[in-house]
Curated annotation (Swiss-Prot):
GO terms for biological process: regulation of translational termination. The gene is prfC. Disulfide bonds: none annotated. It comes from Streptococcus mutans serotype c (strain ATCC 700610 / UA159). One of its GO terms (molecular function) is GTP binding. The keyword Oxidoreductase does not apply. Keywords: Cytoplasm, GTP-binding, Nucleotide-binding, Protein biosynthesis. Belongs to the TRAFAC class translation factor GTPase superfamily. Classic translation factor GTPase family. PrfC subfamily. Gene3D superfamilies: P-loop containing nucleotide triphosphate hydrolases, Peptide chain release factor 3, domain III, Translation factors. The keyword Cell cycle does not apply. This is Peptide chain release factor 3. One of its GO terms (cellular component) is cytosol.
Amino acid sequence: MNLQEEIKKRRTFAIISHPDAGKTTITEQLLYFGGEIREAGTVKGKKTGNFAKSDWMDIEKQRGISVTSSVMQFDYAGKRVNILDTPGHEDFSEDTYRTLMAVDAAVMVVDSAKGIEAQTKKLFEVVKHRGIPIFTFINKLDRDGREPLDLLEELEEVLGIASYPMNWPIGMGRSFEGLYDLYNQRLELYKGDERFASIEDGDKLFANNPFYEQAKEDIELLTEAGNEFSEEAILKGELTPVFFGSALTNFGVQTFLDSFLAFAPEPHGHKTTDDKVIDPLDKDFSGFVFKIQANMDPRHRDRIAFVRIVSGEFERGMSVNLARTGKSVKLSNVTQFMAESRENVENAVAGDIIGVYDTGTYQVGDTLTVGKNKFEFEPLPTFTPELFMKVSAKNVMKQKSFHKGIEQLVQEGAIQLYTNYQTGEYMLGAVGQLQFEVFKHRMENEYNAEVIMTPMGKKTVRWIKEEDLDERMSSSRNILAKDRFNKPVFLFENDFSLHWFADKYPDIVLEEKM
């Protein structure tokens, strides 16, 4: 098969949701259909604890939440599918936002009993800003939930996106009978031996069933007053196709997968800093690092840089140009993933995600190119932390492990590091409290370095220009520090001290990040 055909087979997407909406379960079921796992929640051929395949880090297994984005790949119906499972916990929005820069579409999982929740809304905004297609899966129909019409209305009002139901529930919870498939014009049956039935048979199958009658009434209303189906609007991210189902009982998931692959886009181009768009079908390889993960295999203390291939083909052993340093790097130890299992990869194409073994060469946001055409992709968003803690090594003899751990976890983007300009003290910045807990856990378990962490509370962070730097401006209410790139930054105690500083030094430009 030629390169263009291979690239056109790729479908790369992320799954987003609020915690506990069933994101990991639906990921499992998709892998099951892809033949990657024998049954959801278990790994093919491994006698291990019955943990979800996509939650691989120790702390995730203990808590049942995804705190890192895992990457999984499978083949299905002539397509090569790359799923990026994103952290559902709001404290990890930073990692999630960066992951959303590496996909061509998003699947939003919604709990039918709870509707649109805070975290879903936040992630949706990022996806919408990118203008990529969004597919909605309303989950947990095996339990009692809210009225389907209410859920659609909320989707449109809260998220501001038009919706089109691809199927419609017949009952819910104990009364759940199945789905009326509007798109394929058939019934999908929840009970009994037959999976599908024709619409004509529905009246006989569900004679005198009030839930079937209600479903037909709802559908009639939607046909008259609802949105029209438009593939063009889906691809622009203006219309979300809505699927109902139950990931836990694996009902409606395959129908969703078939439709998703029919409408989801093939890999798209990415913008460079000089506003050019790199076409996926360009023969020259290019890609960017969207995530760095240390210790995916605790036995080897390794680090993996996750690269989204934007154009061309990767071949094992090829040399690439690292735009940030201008140096040439050989890509020889490269893997592809199935959560914790991985295999060496000989070649991969635009749309694929590869893991490059990293000895400290890469940073999140790095651009890799080949050939004479040198450029950099648009920078990935960075987020200003709000919570801060001072951190130091508990055992002075473990300074080496302490510094190595901090350096690796900071490069991974799991936490942000600031150094007090005057005292040299380390200060950690996070978007949410859980990031500190994960940092402490990983320092102790992966680097054998116990840490002392002292809360500093909330801070307002502003960067200043190097030429404006004057240590005399620093005080207990506005601490002068350096970020991990040695750029000067002030940590203000609150908005009052920020405004006081701005009034006192009107010529100093204070810069805010995302």
